[in-house]
Amino acid sequence: IFCQLTAANPTLVKNTLQRVLKQSNMSARLAQDKNQTIDVNAQLKLRKSVAAQEELYEGAVPIYNGIAILVHRPQLEQLDQATRYIETCFQRPAQVIRETEYAWKIWLQTLPIVWEGLLAKPFNRRQLYLTSEVPGLMPLVLPKKGDQEGFELITEEGGTPIHLDLFNQHKNLALFATTRAGKSVLVSGILTQALAHNIPIVALDFPKPDGTSTFTDYTEFMGKEGAYFDISKQSNNLFEQPDLHLLTPEQQQDRLLDYSAFLESALMTMVLGSSTDNKLLSQTIRSLLNLALTAFFADQTIQKRYQEARQEGLGSMAWQHTPTLKDFLRFCSHEHLLLESVGDRVEEALNYIQLRLRFWLSSRVGKAISAPSSFSSDAPLLVFALRNLSDNEDAAILSLSAYSAALRRALSNPASIFFIDEAPILFEFDQIADLVGRMCANGAKAGIRVILSAQDPDTIAQSKAASKILQNLTTRLIGRIQPVAIDSFVQILKYPREIIARNASESFFPRKEGIYSQWLLDDQGVYTFCRYYPGYEQLAVVANNPQEQTARQKAMQHYNDKYEAISVFARQLVASLRGG
């Protein structure tokens, strides 16, 4: 859109307005005297000319305004459609006219190197406005800009870029959308940019029953940059300490206290699960676990084993002897706790702790978190797969294992991302909801950016830490939702019904022909409807339909270079999407 402003001669404009005023006044009188009728057009011109002259005498300046809209399309049919659409955007008396005779000349007039005024020649097609009216016609009105850089979305109105800077600023992000609404594609775009900014990521993934998901292929494509944790094949030591050797002794002490507090919450979940009926037993168990953790980390043998494992590194003999849950279990006894007197309640609590922890040591999930870590936690992208779990407790404990990895990352890096995908099960456990709430509320101190993905806000709102989580998810992206979920967004997140109802319409699904998904961006209470256009190669990496996965696998086998293979498959995928 090009807009050229040229000052007009105020004297000529005043004379013209006076002539219009006289003519309109005369026409109105003649209509009334001869026909006993009212000349509406003459009276309208009369009022407008009087108002314009009033503004001129008060200091307004007349300005010629030449506006041209240049439309580019690769094909003539697309150009016709685009111009017709633009014409329909303007209601009478405003009018947009498509130039078909000398469009080349108008294009030439828009160039800054051409002296000729826009729409001034060969015919003067400029419109005359006053200074109070011109700003409304200038192409200055844009959707409110967010951050200066970051993850890019395109606004639906105006088509201008709007950014979310999760990489240089601390922001927690919530993503709400139904299945097949483009959530995973958008998240992969955010995570890719985070990796480019050297920000480590810990993600919780809920794969399909066959073990495949968006992030299995994505992590595999990342090669050494990614690590996919599967409980059936690998282990992640819950008691692995963060690497704090670069910090001061005082900072090390503070970080260890934070990590001990996390372990206490994790052990409470393992021992009590989601049951909190017996508060007295719960308090006794928490007290005993706290004492046991203090004795555990104060033991010189334990400290020496931690130090040797850290020095020799992953895969060494010392690493295989790093302290784990098995070692901690020995400290949950009378001998290590040094209790002067033991009542029935304490005895019952100790027996219960021993029983539950022994159960976890014998379970599949428990074995995965009670053995030395079998993969390097230095991989920038670390994905935990929550699959083949026998019950909700397994999911909760495995998520705690992922949380421990996220906490280790946070204590060792200035910025990190913790992403939870489809996590309704986890918020049924008070301890886990508390941990996520604590991370949302206090994660800024450790540089943790929390990204939550769900289909609706119900499960989050019903959790114990709902207020901590929802109040600190200051940035939200809402895609296509189910019509039955509208009430949840209105009641829980306080969205105006007329705004959020648009997200439940059929037209809000991702547009395959345009290769984009549609989103409502809520950034600090400012609502903007946006589109996300993924890179074709980005889309090719995370496409997870069975047919798409098969085609991608064939391309990867055919080409030695994985980037060339993805590029070829991307072109095939885009062609198939646009072809329907």
Where are these regions (language model features)?
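Conserved SF1/SF2 helicase motif Ia
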Residues: 197-199
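Short amphipathic alpha-helical segments
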Residues: 65-67, 171, 380-382
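Short flexible coil/turn linkers enriched for glycine and charged/polar residues
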Residues: 61-63, 73, 88-95, 100, ...
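Flexible coil/linker segments and helix-coil junctions enriched in charged and small residues
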Residues: 20-51, 240, 244-253, 308-315, ...
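Conserved P-loop NTPase motor cores
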Residues: 28, 158-161, 166-181, 185-193, ...
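Extended, folded cores of ATP/NTP-driven motor/assembly subunits in large transport
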Residues: 1-132
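P-loop NTPase motor domains
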Residues: 106-161, 206-209, 216-222, 233-448, ...
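P-loop NTPase motor core of the ASCE superfamily
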Residues: 173, 249-307, 460, 464-580
